[in-house]
Amino acid sequence: MLDLNLKIFSSYNEDQDRKVPLMISTTGEEESNSSSSSTTDSAARDAFIAFGILKRDDDLVPPPPPPPHKETGDLFPVVADARRNIEFSVEDSHWLNLSSLQRNTQKMVKKSRRGPRSRSSQYRGVTFYRRTGRWESHIWDCGKQVYLGGFDTAYAAARAYDRAAIKFRGLDADINFVVDDYRHDIDKMKNLNKVEFVQTLRRESASFGRGSSKYKGLALQKCTQFKTHDQIHLFQNRGWDAAAIKYNELGKGEGAMKFGAHIKGNGHNDLELSLGISSSSESIKLTTGDYYKGINRSTMGLYGKQSSIFLPMATMKPLKTVAASSGFPFISMTSSSSSMSNCFDP
């Protein structure tokens, strides 16, 4: 194998070699066995190129050194080092912040599992049921779901959930509104245990849903009137009748009606069930329905007066007689109260 690498031999310096013409000499097969492959002319002092077949290291000339590399540096290397240190410190602090953020997110996830937000409501612990058409509130306690009541609005159900969450889990519980809104309720919660508090919420939701009144036996109907369960008005307590008259249309904008059984100095204290209205004028006549209702609906101008009106006992008839004359069947009723037993004739 022949090594055809070109080798440059020169007796001058490197600067002079660039100015001297070159002569190429080749060696044939006859001179391959000789010890030298090329000769130089000392008089001409010319350089020549030869094939390095014999690879003589003595005649080899090292290549010229490469040109010096130009390096550029900052005018203020100290500032650059400071910037590097700042970058490293920022990266370290950012890494620490990431770890702290991850821990905080994990804590928040664990805390939100107590009361997950409902899909059907924007409030926590509130769910809308299409079957009933109401918003129901629930809370988890000791692995069980506690029913807090059904409400007509999501806001009322959310308020009930917040109060239950504060009662069960304290002031740090996840609620829908601000804790300061329940300062008045917190004072009442201290005197009640969990069972009593849940029963209180359920009672409020039941009365709110049915439109009940603060009076016993009254409920708000669709016609926006408070009516009783018994239209004959056979009640043991006259407060029920007072509430019915107060909240009906005939009682709107009128003065408070007084009943003869509760006024001192009235001689008709034995008035039990049938409540009527009478005036000084004899032209007003009571109908059969007035004995049942206790009100003469035909005289609308009567309510413009602010004076107290009573039904005299002389004009009243027993309920049994009125029922017989009007054609309505009379059903006798028994009660443990003495006031109820005295109302009917034997």
From Swiss-Prot:
- Disulphide-bonded residues: none
GO cellular component terms, alphabetically, are:
nucleus
- Give start-end ranges for the coiled-coil region(s): none
Q: Which UniProt keywords are listed?
A: Activator, DNA-binding, Ethylene signaling pathway, Nucleus, Transcription, Transcription regulation
Q: Name one GO molecular function term.
A: DNA-binding transcription factor activity
* Primary site of residence: nucleus
* UniProt entry tagged with the keyword Ribonucleoprotein: no
Q: Which Pfam families match?
A: AP2
Q: What does this protein do?
A: Probably acts as a transcriptional activator. Binds to the GCC-box pathogenesis-related promoter element. May be involved in the regulation of gene expression by stress factors and by components of stress signal transduction pathways. Repressor of flowering.
Q: What else is known?
A: 'Schlafmuetze' means 'nightcap' in German.
Q: Which family does it belong to?
A: Belongs to the AP2/ERF transcription factor family. AP2 subfamily.
Q: Which PANTHER family match?
A: AP2-LIKE ETHYLENE-RESPONSIVE TRANSCRIPTION FACTOR, AP2-LIKE ETHYLENE-RESPONSIVE TRANSCRIPTION FACTOR SMZ-RELATED
Q: What is this protein called?
A: AP2-like ethylene-responsive transcription factor SMZ
Q: Which organism is it from?
A: Arabidopsis thaliana
UniProt gene name: SMZ
